[in-house]
Amino acid sequence: MQLAIVAVGHKMPAWIETGFNEYTKRMPPELRIELREVKPETRSSSNNAATVMQREAARIEAVLGSLSKQCRIVALDERGKDWTTVQLAEQLTGWQREGGDVAFLIGGADGLDPALKARAHTLLRISSLTLPHGMVRVLLAEQLYRAWSVTQNHPYHRA
């Protein structure tokens, strides 16, 4: 099973790449995390937020098209469901049992296009705080690793 993180944005600071890579390398080979970066759209007087989100959505759709047809889509959104780490671990176990890959979508500065959110199987809120998009990558990778550690009774998670 592959966990794809499809994120708008590129050229992240080194500390974000280091943090993200730290958690992805800890994942077992049968549950690897792959980052797919999507170029952000530049906002201007002729590009309002809706236009920006639509153009970024087209790029995200192109990435989703390269993943398996049975890929489950989880869109990160401030209005999404709040899951505990244990609930995420339960979801991860269920996804593994069902088979297929999972794509986590991280939008750009304006968020995800409403059509993408409507297409998602799940809307997930990673935090009630406003976070830099690069940091969300690191937090998501860490939480996926932590969820996996819960399923394995690994001592990393000590709640």
From Swiss-Prot:
> Which EC main class describes this enzyme?
transferase
Q: Where in the cell is it found?
A: Cytoplasm
Question: Which InterPro entries does the protein's record reference?
Answer: Alpha/beta_knot_MTases, RlmH-like, tRNA_m1G_MTases_N
EC no. given is 2.1.1.177
Main localisation? cytoplasm
Assembly and partners are described as: Homodimer.
Identify the NCBIfam families for this entry: PRK00103.1-4, tRNA_RlmH_YbeA
The name of this protein is Ribosomal RNA large subunit methyltransferase H
Gene of this entry? rlmH
